[in-house]
Each structure stands twice: as structure tokens, then as C-alpha cells.
Amino acid sequence: MASEGDKMLGGRFVGSTDPVMEMLSASITIDQRLAEVDIQGSMAYAKALEKAGILSKSELEKTLSGLEKISEEWSKGVFVVTPTDEDIHTANERRLKELIGDIAGKLHTGRSRNDQVVTDLKLFMKNSLSVISTHLLQLIKTLVERAAIEVDVILPGYTHLQKTQPIRWSQFLLSHAVALTRDSERLGEIKKRINILPLGSGALAGNPLEIDRELLRSELDFASISLNSMDAVRQRDSVVEFLSVAALLMIHLSKMAEDLIIYSTSEFGFLTLSDTYCTGSSVMPQKKNPDSLELIRSKAGRVFGRLAAILMVLKGLPSTYNKDLQEDKEAVFDVVDTLNAVLQVATGVISTLQINKENMEKALSPEILSSDLALYLVHKGMPFRQAHVASGKAVHLAESKGITLNNLSLDDLKSISPLFGSDVSQVFNVVNSVEQYTALGGTAKSSVTAQIEQLRELLKRHKEQA
């Protein structure tokens, strides 16, 4: 328990803090992940203080040297956290004083933990977004390149988990890749708003020392400077935006995981997951559990929970800084870690799974060509609504006879519509079926190939911006 004299900010207090209160308030076990960016911010601020005449050149040199020593201790894992270290800021400042003496007390001149912590968090998020973007782009690339290799593989498409129309396996892969490109774009968009410097805003009223904020911006590599000091220290829009984008990304990853889980079941048998990403059963030795995909699916709920929690924290706060905002960092750290792990595992799953072409072909039952039968009649001049009814009658007739749709005789079909001719047999060919969909975005080979090329170009642009 810290005594009155041990408190870094304890000048106006009498007595000791309740140890339970100290435990509740302390965040050092969580926010020590900000150690390096906190030091970066302090180095930049020390230079600004020297320019403002608060630090002499000699004091600046000692301060920077001390901060470099602290950075080295953190990187080597030898920094010692003490019971009086409430958070990463007080820990670093306490250690700096041990190294360079009372000069360390000048470093916080004109600076508040309010603008310090939000600067640290933004620096952390900038770095993290770059890493997440790299992992996301690698996953998209893996999907796209696999689609290019397996472009001739055809399987049933599904709605309501029922067979609908034949599609290319590549069309399925690209459907997920395209969704993920939007997530990549959103990550780039929020990075622009994160890239605004809050340091120099003080507690809420601004900085009274004519601190050169342009110097701070340049030193910390921010794109611009916050316009209003009160808004700068209170805003956690960037946290909410990041968690929101993360939640949407996890929806897309969860959906992909669910599809692959279904396709990998013995009932479907469309693909086999690598043993690297599966586990066995503790009771049933024949089982191969898709744990990797199930964990991806479940982690989506974890991210949603973090977003919901921070929204509830923020919704009723008055202006500027409140201690409630301490909750933001744990949410960000957890979601950053979750995304990095999930994206890498998803990439591994996609790159190592094996498709079972025979099972995909076996699942291409003639009934999934009933819409093609309707299109056949449309090409013969029948309005689509009538053609749809006629095709449905053909399906019903085949079911009542206990045969497949393609085994109906020409007489059977003519009993439904005289427009059916001997060329109707061409309808019952899955390659012909998928090749009808040549419009941009369709499942014809030419369209799929065009999608692949467009996505490759998009990946190049996103990689340059990451």
C-alpha cells in the first residue's frame, strides 16, 4: 500500500489509499504494453520542452539518455515494476527520476496524463493497424491465389443450406475475399482519423508553455494536429471505430469459418482440413474436430463484447477525461491480439485445406439445374414467371415419378410446355450452366478470372497504403 509520501500525485491528500482502491485503480499490468510508445511520446515532449526553454540542452540530453535506458530495460524484460507504479506513465517517470534525479520532474511540465495516455494509445493503434492490415492482406491474397489455381472446380451453391445453382469453387473463395477487402478499406479509413496528434492539449484547456505542437507531430509521425484540446483528451471515437471495424471483420471471418466447417463435415465431404488446424476427440478416436474454425467463429463474440462494453462506458460520460476511460486500453489490446491470431490461423487453414472434387461433383444433382430449365424456356420466348412455373412442374413431375429431373422424357417435358425440344438435353450440363453467368461478378470462368485480376490490383494498392 502506498503511503502519502509515496504517492506521485499525493500532495493534497492526507492518509493512505485503501489497498482495494489501489488494486481497482491500478492498470500497470495491462497498460505496460504502452511502455515503448509512452517513452516515444516523452522523448518528443522533452524536445518540445527544450525548445520552449523549460529544459536546458544538458537537461534534455540527460532526459533522453534516461528514457533510452528505460526503453532498453523494457525491451530486455528487466524493468522492475514497483507496488507504487499505478500505471505505465508513473512507472516510467518513477524510473526516470531514479536514473537522472529531480530533472525528471520537469518532463511533465504542461503535460497531463489526459493527453499523454490518448497519445500513447493512438501510437499503439497506428502500429497495430499496420500489422493487422498486413495479416488481412495475406489472407485475401491466399484466397485469391487459391481461386486462380482451382478455377475449374464446380460445386453446388447453397441458400437456406439447400442446393440452388452450380458455382465455381473459386466464386465461393472470392466471395469471402471481396468482403475482406472492404474490411481492409475500413482499416485504412480509421487510420486516417487515428493519425491526429492529441499531445499538447494538456488536461483539457491546452498547453500554457507555447509548446511547438508541429514539432511534436513531426517527431511522432502524426499526419495532423487536434483542433480542440477538450475534444482531444476525451475522444475515444478511434477506439469505437476500431472495435466496430474489428467486429465487422470478425463477422466475415466467422461466416467463412462456418461455411468451411459445414463443407468439412462427413455429410458434405467437400474438403479436408489439415491436421495442423484440427484436434481429436477425447472419447471418439475417429473424429477430427475443426477447432481452428470453431475458435475463429467464437472469437467473433468476444470482439462484439468488447465493442458493447466500451460503448456502454462512453455513453454517459461528461466532457473531457474521466477514469472510466481506463477501460479502453484492455479492449483495444484484446481485440488487437484476437485479430492477429485469427487472421494468421485463417490464412493457414485456407492455404492447407484439400478439396474433394469427387464429392463436389457427386453433389451436383440435376435438380440444381431447374433454374436453367426455366432459362431455356425464356430463350424460347416464354415470360420468366411462366417459365418458372413450368420448371417447377417439371421438378414435381420428376419427384412424383421417382426419377431425377434430367431423366424426364421429352414427352414428359412437352406435356408441360410445347416449347421444350430435343436440345433441352444441353441444359443438364453443369459447365454449360456456370458459363451462362458471364456478366461482371458472375461465376463464368471469364468473370471469375476478371475478379481475380481486379482483386490482385486492389491488393497492390492496399499493400502500398498499409
Curated annotation (Swiss-Prot):
Pfam families documented for this protein: ASL_C2 (PF14698), Lyase_1 (PF00206)
Keyword Lyase among UniProt keywords: yes
Binding annotation for 2-(N(omega)-L-arginino)succinate: 27, 114, 159, 289, 321, 326, 329
Entry coiled-coil feature ranges: none
Listed pathway(s): Amino-acid biosynthesis; L-arginine biosynthesis; L-arginine from L-ornithine and carbamoyl phosphate: step 3/3
GO BP terms in the entry: arginine biosynthetic process via ornithine; L-arginine biosynthetic process
Keywords noted in UniProt: Amino-acid biosynthesis, Arginine biosynthesis, Eye lens protein, Lyase
Role description: Delta crystallin, the principal crystallin in embryonic lens, is found only in birds and reptiles. This protein also functions as an enzymatically active argininosuccinate lyase, but it has a low activity.
Protein name per its UniProtKB record: Argininosuccinate lyase
